[in-house]
Amino acid sequence: MIINAKGPASFAEKYIVRSIWDNKFPPGSILPAERELSELIGVTRTTLREVLQRLARDGWLKIQHGKPTQVNNFWETSGLNILETIADLNPEGFPVLVDQLLSARTNVSAIYFRGALRNNPDQAVDVLAGIHQLENTAEAFAEFDYQLHHRLAFSSGNPLYVLILNGFKGLYSRVGRYYFSSSDARALALNFYVELEKLALAKNYIDVPAVMRSYGINSGKMWQRLRDDMPADIAQDKS
């Protein structure tokens, strides 16, 4: 097992998570005793204890006082906060993960975009006014697109959508910079922003789903053109 880590705690965390992913520690199994596991990984028991607590908070493990530590089925117990970890564990499956991420965001965004234009159209107009000063660069478009979603999610009246977006942020920021490196993708997005601004100015929330659906289809086709050339290191969080 080859693991790149910045320190003992990071190494221990990646070792355990990789072992769970590779089914060395399958769901429902019991982790080795603390002393044995710390010797196996090569870290102190104090460091291991901190790592186990962190992994339990993320849903990988179940820790109960007086009982051995049990491995969870993370698909049932974890949240969006492990997306970065899954991308790191399975780089070969990263394009599919991105497909699923974009599909989920498209479906959810149709709800909060409509909610924002219905409940706070003036705030939507204010956000969308930024398109008139938007630089024609991948970085500028990726940042604007994220902020657009984030602010309209807040304006929708349901802040839980913001928490969902926060779970996407790291991966989406990196993928977004790659996607918007295409001038065609930027042109497609700009046209979508313009149409959305027209709806916001008219306080027309009824037609938002149709505009979102059209952009979702077209941007999905654009992504399929671009995904096979996506650099492999986008899966890695270098922060």
Swiss-Prot record:
Multifunctional regulator of fatty acid metabolism. InterPro entries: FA-response_TF_FadR, FadR_C, TF_FadR/GntR_C, Tscrpt_reg_HTH_GntR, WH-like_DNA-bd_sf, WH_DNA-bd_sf. Keywords: Activator, Cytoplasm, DNA-binding, Fatty acid metabolism, Lipid metabolism, Repressor, Transcription, Transcription regulation. SMART domains: HTH_GNTR. GO terms for biological process: fatty acid metabolic process; regulation of fatty acid metabolic process. GO terms for cellular component: cytoplasm. Homodimer. This is Fatty acid metabolism regulator protein. It holds the Pfam family GntR. One of its GO terms (molecular function) is DNA-binding transcription factor activity. It comes from the Bacteria. It is found in: Cytoplasm. Residues 34-53 bind DNA. Residues 6-74 form the HTH gntR-type domain. HAMAP family: HTH_FadR (MF_00696).
